[in-house]
Every structure is written in C-alpha cells, then in structure tokens.
Amino acid sequence: MSLDFLPFSRPSIGEDEIAAVEQVLRSGWITTGPKNQELEQRFAERLGCRHAVALSSATGALHVTLLALGIGPGDEVITPSLTWVSTANVITLLGATPVFVDVDRDTLMCSAQAVEAAIGPRTRAIVPVHYAGSTLDLEGLRTVAGRHGIALVEDAAHAVGSEYRGRPVGSRGTAIFSFHAIKNLTCAEGAMFVSDDSALAERVRRLKFHGLGVDAYDRLSHGRKPQAEVIEPGFKYNLADLNAALALVQLKRLDALNARRQALAERYLERLAGLPLAPLGLPAHKQRHAWHLFILRIDAEACGLGRDAFMEALKARGIGSGIHFIASHLHHYYRQRQPRLSLPNSEWNSARLCSIPLFPDMRDDDIERVARAIEDILEKRR
C-alpha cells in the first residue's frame, strides 16, 4: 500500500483560523485595520516588549529596520553567512556591505567573539540569527554591541516562542519574527518587528507604509483628514487584516503548537539515537527551544551517502526534506564579490544540512515512518 507524501512542513490550520478569516472577509475591511492593531497589542503583551509593528514579511521588516537605523552606502553590517540569503540581499540593496562571520559547527549560531573580531571602523549593525528554534548567547552579543556602540537586531524568524534565560526572545532589545507559511506561528506571509526603542519603532511604523504618519484605517475609519502627509519616502510593507486574523488565532495556539513540536523532536532524538546523523547541538545557556526545524547533518563518510542522495532516497519513500541553509557567501552573487572568503564551519554544514519533517499535525507514527526510512537508507549503504 502506498503512503501519502509526507512534506517536511505543513501549516496547522483549524476551523478557528478559517472562521477568523471569514469574519474579516465579511466585515468590509480586509486590509490593515483593527485586527492588525490587535495582533500588535497581543504580541507585545505576550513578549513583554514595549513596541510591536506588524509587517508583510521579515525581509521587509529587516529592510525598514536597517534603513531606520541609518544604514546605507559605505556602512558594514555583520551577519552569519549561514542563514537565509535575504539578510545579505537587504544589506546589499541598502548600499551597505554584508560582513559574513562563521558559526559554531554544531549550534549553527555565531558567537560574540566571532562578531567582535569582525568589527571595523565602518560597522554599523549586527544581525545575528536564532537558529531552528534554538537561541543565541545574547548576553555576549549585547555586551559587544554596547561596547562598540553598534546596533543589534536579532533575526528571530525561527524563534517565536523561544526563551533565553527564562525570558521570551524579543522581550528586550530589537528583534524580527517571521510568520511565513512554515513558521511556528503562520499567517501565510507576515512578520513582527519588536523593540524597546521608541524612536526606532516609530520610524519603522512610518517606513512600512509609504512614510505616512497614519495608515488607511486611521484616515478613513476614524474621521481623520483623508490626505496624510509623507514624512519621508517609505514602502508598502503593511500586513492585511486577513493575515492578522489568522495570526491572532495562531498566537493563542502557540504554546500548544510548540509543545507538540517539542514532543515530536524528543521522539526523533530518541528514535534516531545511535545513527551517524549528527543532529544540531544545543547551547550551554538555559533556553526554551521552539523546535522550528529538526536538522540532521548527512556526512558521506559517516553515512555512506551524501546529503543530496539522502534527500532523494527520502523522496523515493514519500518523505519530504529541506536545506536550511546554503551559506550566503556560497551563492553566485556573493561568491563573485568575495571569492577568497573562507568560513569552514558554514561551508561544512552547507554541504550536509538536511531538515526532516517536523510540524504540529504530524502523528506519532509519522515519526516512526521517517525513522524507519532513514534506517533503511543507511542500512543499504553499509
């Protein structure tokens, strides 16, 4: 009997999400409005942060955040190469230069020491990445950023629901979360900027909507003058209420969704123990892991086949997988500009990373199916 294809990720959408979106569709106001405002309020309350601004994507959020910080031509921004390439793209599109640093071989996160070694006279910001639901050593990074007077913007795209030393990621400083379709909290496409910097938050809010001081809902629904003034040129990165309504329901479910992810991840760790798969290591500090991804490292010498062949073998058995990520400096555009850059840990992992299925609606027997498939693949190579 053939089994249905098991994707590496699938959003957990229930009747409450469908009803919430339907309510917005019937309300007569489907773009940025009251649901967007409620989402910002609820998200800030959950984290305990001062400001939350909803946007249409984490890429857009990073764009306007760096712009609001004054990043531009001649500046440098330090970021790990082993992350989604949108970070490097945004830095480059602002006219600045991404300065790539290597990551720890096992946690895939950059250290304060690596970041400080990369700081130069033109460094204006640091964009480190919480990886796969695990958390950065923020204290060290905050110390380095403060010592050099450099902005720190946490890429928390993987970390909604994660905690660092007992506090939610994003409760202090500035961070950006993603609500993309595969994330722990999804609204199809969306993001949240959070910060305790009032001036920065105000400018991000303005830049996300054409540089206007108010949005369309404020102007048309609250009786304010229909033509607001442009304070500065901005962009169109606002989040529609259709998306915000979906995110609000997901936010209420987040603890349960993440608890299920953790249970599945723990089952994987138990079931795959003893196999030469090298799952990611965990940092030494106290944390709550959000388990956005479950990542293996497939080394040809240890496993008898390389990562790409392993993924093809999973696919042949009806199981999806993903790569998170190919290091940014290995992409054609950046390789052309920094041909001599060597980041050994990022490069080693780029050739071996494989994300296997992990999402809340998986059944326990799905874990068993994946584990047996992996055992079968490895056994055939011995």
Swiss-Prot record:
PANTHER family recorded: DTDP-4-AMINO-4,6-DIDEOXYGALACTOSE TRANSAMINASE, TRANSAMINASE
Protein's pathway: Nucleotide-sugar biosynthesis; UDP-4-deoxy-4-formamido-beta-L-arabinose biosynthesis; UDP-4-deoxy-4-formamido-beta-L-arabinose from UDP-alpha-D-glucuronate: step 2/3; Bacterial outer membrane biogenesis; lipopolysaccharide biosynthesis
GO molecular function: pyridoxal phosphate binding; UDP-4-amino-4-deoxy-L-arabinose aminotransferase
Subunit: Homodimer.
Organism: Pseudomonas aeruginosa (strain UCBPP-PA14)
Sites of N6-(pyridoxal phosphate)lysine modification: 183
The enzyme's E.C. designation: 2.6.1.87
Keyword Nucleotidyltransferase attributed: no
GO biological process: lipid A biosynthetic process; lipopolysaccharide biosynthetic process; response to antibiotic
Assigned keywords, A-Z: Aminotransferase, Antibiotic resistance, Lipid A biosynthesis, Lipid biosynthesis, Lipid metabolism, Lipopolysaccharide biosynthesis, Pyridoxal phosphate, Transferase
Required co-factors: pyridoxal 5'-phosphate
Gene3D superfamilies: Aspartate Aminotransferase, domain 1, Type I PLP-dependent aspartate aminotransferase-like (Major domain)
Phylogenetic lineage: Bacteria, Pseudomonadati, Pseudomonadota, Gammaproteobacteria, Pseudomonadales
Catalysed reactions, as listed in the record: UDP-4-amino-4-deoxy-beta-L-arabinose + 2-oxoglutarate = UDP-beta-L-threo-pentopyranos-4-ulose + L-glutamate
First-level EC class: transferase
Designated name of the protein: UDP-4-amino-4-deoxy-L-arabinose--oxoglutarate aminotransferase
